[in-house]
A protein has these predicted regions:
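C-terminal binding/interaction regions
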Residues: 3-32, 38-46, 51-160
């Protein structure tokens, strides 16, 4: 009878981060981690933004989602100017704790995008092999400008 012997090898140091119960987020060299924000009731992706440690702490402490604005170089409490405050329902972290998934409810008009739309993902990339074209997929914007939704933007799929 040949029995398998379990190895007593030293455990992988990433196993606690990947399989353990300790929340130990890993931020990139720029101090940021990606956050995908999802409508908690519908499951739609609303936006993708970034969090630094301060934004994450503020989000968890207040229940209102905060991000790090790369363009302004400042902490950003979503909704301060637009009224589209995002209340955290649930926060998830990916396997190696360097990306977050925030399930939220949105106050105000329910929008998340600075363009006035509910989601930042309102265009589909279509291609015929050589040329990529952006087609608007959301039937209307929150401000009712459906003409904007019918416009298309052309670009080359590959660099010249």
């Amino acid at each position: 009878m040949n029995e398998r012997v379990k190895s007593k090898a030293r455990p992988d140091p990433t196993s606690d981060r990947e399989e353990g119960g300790a929340f130990d987020p890993k931020f990139g060299a720029d101090g940021l981690a990606t956050c995908v924000t999802v409508d908690a009731s519908r499951g739609d992706v609303l936006m993708v933004a970034h969090m630094n440690e301060a934004a994450l702490r503020a989000t968890l402490a207040t229940g209102i989602v905060h991000y790090w604005s790369r363009s302004r170089g400042a902490l950003w409490r979503k909704g301060d100017t637009s009224g589209q405050t995002q209340t955290l329902v649930e926060m998830r972290v990916d396997c190696d704790q360097d990306a977050f998934l925030a399930f939220v409810t949105v106050a105000g008009d329910g929008g998340a995008c600075h363009t006035g739309r509910r989601s930042c993902f309102y265009r589909r990339v279509q291609t015929d092999g050589d040329t990529a074209r952006l087609a608007f997929i959301e039937p209307s914007t929150l401000n009712g400008d459906s003409e904007t939704d019918r416009q298309h933007v052309d670009c080359k799929a590959t660099p010249d």
